[in-house]
Amino acid sequence: MRKLFTLFALLPFMTFSASAQSILKGDVNEDGAVDISDVVALVNIILNGSGSQSYPSCPDDHHPHLIDLGLPSGTKWACCNVGATAPQGEGGYYAWGETDEKDVYDWTAYIRSGGTEESCQNLGANISGTQYDVATKMWGNSWQMPSSEQIKELVDNCTCEWVEYNGAKGMKFIGPNDGFIFLPAAGYRDGSNLFSRGSGYYWSGTQYSSYDYCAYGLFFNSGISILYDYDRYLGQPVRPVAK
């Protein structure tokens, strides 16, 4: 009991990566809820002598926030997906170049084509920040879809860890400065169905260089994280970056 009392007496003098405001509110792990997980987080901080956290440290619950990963380009990534209210949220699923969700995702329903892959409109090499960018439309001009180069930079410069956060499985990307983001393995939509929940499929704003009907995106599962290309009609989440 004396040891426990001493630990709590030292609490005000210890250094934490969690914000002081969050600790005072009881939301130690800054996940937006005060529950038993905060008790566990506080005990780990005290007993392990470490204030390091496992997930993005947002200053409040008013997402999105910018997360600095220490990437060479200086690119800052959003803490959550377009349409999500927290890092673990899947958010919306969007066809490439469309800015609204819908019930069916196929070539016929894809408004940027005439109903077939051959009739896809060429929207330009990179739609990031344009009228076709769902991040810019939904969040404003300070945000945009990442380019394929920014996704490649993320993959090449971050340590990837497969983790579970608030019930959501996904990938934690840890940057050179130990900043990090969590991307839920939200799957993708094809037709009227959701497929491959447990893997991550995220759009970039960059059209595929060889075929107009494809665009680049991020793919990851528990074993790999790579830049890949997808048919543009598919419904996939978007994780924005700052302009």
Regions flagged by a language model, labelled:
Residues 4-18:
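Sec-dependent N-terminal signal peptides
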Residues 6, 38-41, 153:
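Hydrophobic side chains within alpha-helical segments
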Residues 22-54:
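Alpha-helical segments with a strong preference for the paired helices of cellulosomal dockerin domains
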Residues 56-65, 69-243:
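C-terminal, surface-exposed recognition/capping segments
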